[in-house]
Regions:
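Bacterial Sec-dependent N-terminal signal peptides
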Residues: 1-20
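Accessory carbohydrate-recognition regions in carbohydrate-active enzymes
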Residues: 20-174
Length: 174
């Protein structure tokens, strides 16, 4: 009987040690393609702020581009060209048609045309309340987080000239 109790106690303790929180099962990339209009950005449940990657303009390599057709979401998982972080988009309803204020970090010489300052990216990760990626063109790490009433971004730049551009929503030819 003592061996049975010891074995059950061991299994209970081992199971508790390996337990995951429900947040560990969240996949922020669900619904980010095939017209799902969701985004993997830093969003806090019931929060007033969402910091969202914007990858739907500026490159012919993108599957979906907001300037070539109607497209109501700031992000599509199949796209690969990043032009900034939006701080005003809702997940699940799209909404860049109402305007998107984008922050975009760049390095080197200043260029304000999003067709040229945008960048491909890698190392994209997302979890509830956090989003990050690495801009391959500039070697800049982009991170975003959100709380109930605040969105924060952090850009880690290489040495040399660097810029943070703010796109107020116009097209490059305007």
């Amino acid at each position: 009987m003592k061996k049975l109790i010891a074995s059950l106690s061991f299994l209970f303790i081992w199971n508790c040690a390996n337990a995951q929180d429900p947040v560990d099962y969240v996949d922020p990339f669900i619904g980010t393609t095939n017209f799902g209009t969701c985004n993997p950005g830093a969003v806090c449940p019931n929060g007033l702020m969402s910091v969202v990657p914007f990858n739907v303009m500026g490159s012919e390599d993108n599957t979906y581009d907001k300037d070539s057709r109607w497209w109501s979401t700031p992000y599509d998982y199949t796209n690969s060209y990043f032009t900034g972080l939006s701080h005003v988009n809702l997940s699940g309803v799209g909404c860049p048609e109402m305007g998107s204020l984008l922050l975009m970090p760049t390095a080197g010489e200043l260029n304000v045309d999003y067709h040229h300052y945008g960048s491909k990216y890698e190392k994209e990760t997302a979890s509830p309340g956090y989003y990050s990626l690495q801009l391959t063109k500039y070697n800049i790490k982009v991170e975003a987080t959100a709380t109930l009433r605040t969105g924060l971004t952090r850009f880690t730049f290489p040495k040399g000239k660097s810029h943070i551009l703010m796109n107020l929503g116009g097209r490059a030819d305007q």
